[in-house]
Regions:
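A short linear-motif detector with a strong N-terminal bias
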Residues: 1-2, 7-9, 47-52, 85, ...
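Conserved small/polar residues in nucleotide/adenosyl-binding loops
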Residues: 151-158
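N-terminal TM1-TM2 helical hairpin plus the immediately adjacent luminal interfacial "cap"
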Residues: 14-140
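C-terminal transmembrane module of polytopic alpha-helical membrane proteins
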Residues: 1-17, 24-26, 161
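Membrane-interface loop-to-helix entry segments
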Residues: 136-150
Length: 161
């Protein structure tokens, strides 16, 4: 068991930035899943526990938890959600690094997540269709962060040609 943990630590240290982001996302997913299991085993309600890490659509709730603009992009709703986000990050992260640096990928990942989160909040607070759902809507997952790396890559290819 100790060698597995040592190997994981070493892979994290030596891995590319996209591997490190995948490790962080998977670690958060495992921790939240284990927390959910523990709550269920002890017949405790999980309602509201992770809302403090998910991005609320409500501006008033966001003011009370501004850190959620960063934490939401590391939370995932289920196995398939994290699987496809991490596959997307793995494939396009490697491709991204063939044109840009690790620092660029980290920045694009974080800024893409922040911009995606702000766009989500703006949409829920501007468009009348979403207004009735604003108070109980939350965003989670790397779905805003990961595709930005691909679109940034496509923009670079377009300018290069």
């Amino acid at each position: 068991m100790a060698t597995i943990i040592t190997d994981l630590k070493e892979t994290f240290r030596r891995g590319n930035i996209y591997i490190q982001l995948i490790y962080i996302n998977v670690a958060v997913f495992i921790l939240t899943t284990l927390t959910e299991v523990m709550f269920q085993l002890f017949n405790r309600s999980i309602a509201g526990v992770f809302e403090w890490l998910e991005l609320p659509a409500s501006v008033i709730r966001f003011i009370l938890q501004p850190w959620s603009l960063l934490t939401y992009m590391f939370m995932h709703a289920g196995f398939m959600h994290i699987l496809f986000n991490m596959l997307w990050l793995y494939w396009f992260g490697a491709l991204f690094l063939s044109f840009f640096s690790a620092k660029h990928l980290r920045g694009v990942y974080i800024l893409g997540g922040i911009c995606g989160g702000l766009l989500y909040m703006a949409a829920y607070n501007i468009f009348p269709y979403f207004r009735p759902m604003t108070d109980y809507s939350f965003m989670l997952g790397a779905s805003a962060s990961v595709p930005v790396s691909y679109t940034h890559l496509r923009a670079h290819e377009t300018r290069s040609n």
